[in-house]
Amino acid sequence: MFGGVNVYAAIEFSGASDLYFFLFFMLLKTLREEVLEANLELVRRGLVLYTFGNVSGMDRGEALVAIKPSGVPYADLTPAHIVVSDLAGTIVDGALRPSSDLATHLELYKHFSNIGGVAHTHSEFATAWAQAETPIPCFGTTHADYFQGPVPVTERLSEAEIAGDYELETGAAICRTFAKLDPNSIPAVLVAGHAPFCWGASAAAAAHNAVILEYVARMACHTLAINTESRPLARELHDKHFLRKHGRNAYYGQVKSQ
C-alpha cells in the first residue's frame, strides 16, 4: 500500500498529486516486472524447484525493494504478486507475504551500496559446496571471468542467532564474510549449511550471477573428481580474465554508443 492505496491496482488519479502518483505507480510496475522476470530466469535455467529460491530488486532512489512472495509457485506468479517493502521491512505495497528471506536481502542492500538485485537459490552444486562449508576454488578462467577470487563461505550461525532473527543474522553473517572482501568483485557467497546468495547491479544481473555460480560450482566438482590435486588458477591469469571484463580498462565486449 502507498498512502493507503493499492498502487498496482489503481486506475484513477485525482487532485494535485496525480503526476507523483502516476510516476510512483509506473516505478513500482517496472520494478515488479523486472523482479518477476529475474525470478522466472531461475526457473528457465533449472536453478529452482517448486517454490525454492527468490530474487529481489531495489530502486535506490526511492529506497524500495521488490521481492518474490513466500511460497507461491513460479508458474502462478504475476507482477501483482511481487511484494514491495522499504529497507526497514515495512510492506509498502502488495497483498501477499514477502519471501521469508526478505531480511537477508535487506541486510545486503544496506551494506553493499552498489547492488540493485539479490538472488537466492538452492541450486544443486553451489548448495553442495555450502553444505560442505568449503569455498569454491578458481580452477579456470570461466570462474575468473566473474569472480575475482574463490567464492567464500560464511561462518556457521550460533544457536542464539538461529533462535533469534534468523534471516537477519544470515545477512549479517554474509556481511561479516565480506568485511575484507569486495562484494563487487565477488558477487556471491555460500551460506554455511544453507545455500548460495548472489547479487548484482539489478535483479537480472543477480539472477545471471546465480546461473554462472552454479556452472562454476559444477565445473569445480568435476575438476576435483578428475584430479583431486588440481591447483587453483595462477593469480596473474585469474586477475587478467576478471579485469579485462570488469576492470577500469576493460576491453571485453563492445563499446557502448553515446
Q: Whereabouts are the PLM-identified features?
A:
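Glycine-rich flexible loops
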Residues: 26-258
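Short hydrophobic alpha-helical segments enriched in small aliphatic residues
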Residues: 7-9
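Cationic, low-complexity basic patches in intrinsically disordered or flexible, solvent-exposed regions
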Residues: 13
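Hydrophobic alpha-helical signal peptides and transmembrane signal-/tail-anchor segments
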Residues: 18-25
